């Protein structure tokens, strides 16, 4: 496999991963059972304002990118210019990613409010939640495995873990808990009830990581073959 073919295939798989990830995250919100922790703040704000969810996700991603840049400038490790260039490239990726989410948001109805009959029922909504978690896990695995540009949500966790010298998994838990706490505060402060946090939030916290592990275990050979540089 030539270097050019290798790069093209990695970009195609990365793009496929982004598309699947956007579907999973959007589908999660449409079940009305609770969104993933890191997106709970933009989701709650979108419900309290007239700003669309994808637009607020983009703003949240820009904030994550800014945090990464500040951390990398502070740490001054490795080729800082190269690292900062990669950080900034996340803005373009985030813009494309959130536009894909916007398309899905237009096409997919809110199941318990905009659908009828079986599509409103709890079993169907849980089925869609499971599908959302599977899509989120597969999409995240594909984008991470291609080693191109990190999703800002993953990138900020990695940067914070590096700053505080803790395992990425532990830092991810702290970030998730912080997002949930902020969402609960904003919800109660401005509406008097919980927005965006539910059983789906807890299932997503546990389930997405498991899906990533299973996917990488099943497709390790085929995925790694795309990442190898020719000898």
Predicted regions and their residues:
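Core subunits and conserved enzymes of cellular information-processing
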Residues: 2-231
């Amino acid at each position: 496999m030539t270097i050019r073919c290798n790069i093209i295939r990695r970009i195609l798989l990365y793009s496929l991963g982004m598309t699947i990830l956007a579907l999973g995250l959007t589908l999660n919100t449409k079940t009305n059972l609770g969104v993933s922790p890191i997106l709970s703040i933009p989701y709650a704000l979108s419900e309290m304002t007239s700003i669309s969810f994808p637009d607020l996700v983009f703003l949240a991603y820009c904030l994550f990118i800014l945090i990464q840049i500040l951390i990398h400038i502070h740490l001054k490790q490795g080729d800082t210019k190269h690292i900062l260039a990669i950080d900034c490239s996340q803005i373009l990726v985030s813009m494309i990613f959130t536009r894909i989410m916007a398309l899905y948001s237009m096409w997919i109805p809110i199941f318990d409010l905009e659908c009828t009959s079986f599509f409103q029922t709890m079993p169907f909504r849980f089925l869609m939640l499971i599908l959302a978690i599977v899509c989120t896990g597969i999409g995240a695995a594909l984008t991470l495995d291609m080693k191109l540009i990190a999703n800002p949500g993953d990138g900020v966790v990695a940067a914070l873990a590096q700053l505080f010298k803790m395992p990425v998994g532990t830092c991810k838990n702290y970030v998730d808990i912080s997002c949930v706490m902020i969402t609960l505060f904003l919800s109660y402060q401005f509406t008097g009830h919980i927005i965006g946090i539910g059983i789906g939030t807890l299932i997503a916290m546990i389930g997405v990581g498991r899906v990533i592990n299973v996917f990488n275990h099943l497709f390790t050979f085929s995925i790694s073959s795309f990442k190898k540089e020719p000898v």
